[in-house]
């Protein structure tokens, strides 16, 4: 009898532990208005600390669902932006950011939220289907960020992200021009390379752009234009290997 009683006690304890675990591990979909907002935030924090960032974001959003406009809602939305960003769920992060900024534009957390929103675009540049659109969004979003927060501690990071995105776009345009050259369409290549020169002030790609222009000019027999571009390169990019290559290209063509 004592043995059976002992087994029953162990079983009862086990069941109680399971119930407690189930309560503490409640899924985001199981949250309701009966939960306190602070409890939901805590569940999100626990998931975040364990590295379950997407689930943490889901928890935080539940606060907005059941307790909009509350102090906890402001906190929950800002945490959702962060959590989804770290989970690389960039669209979810931006949706949470947009909701936060529309509800709490004067919040002390708005700067951080907008930073994450801008950075999410930049981090999508390596996604082939999004690359150029993401780069343009990265630039425009961070320009808006710097306009609103010119003295931000994240200013240098924002400026670097803008510079990297612009450099990426120049590289993409250069590749288009080079594609035209390979397809034996130097006229289209020239238009592309000239546009890059007209719209780009600073880029590590500019010496190659001028070199490719010379290539294109020579293919069309435009010796004068090729010579002028090579002279420009000597003045502008005197230490570049592309300038040396352009000189060899001119010499090989027989242009004086």
Regions found by a protein language model. Give the residues of each.
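Sec-dependent bacterial lipoprotein signal peptides
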Residues: 1-23
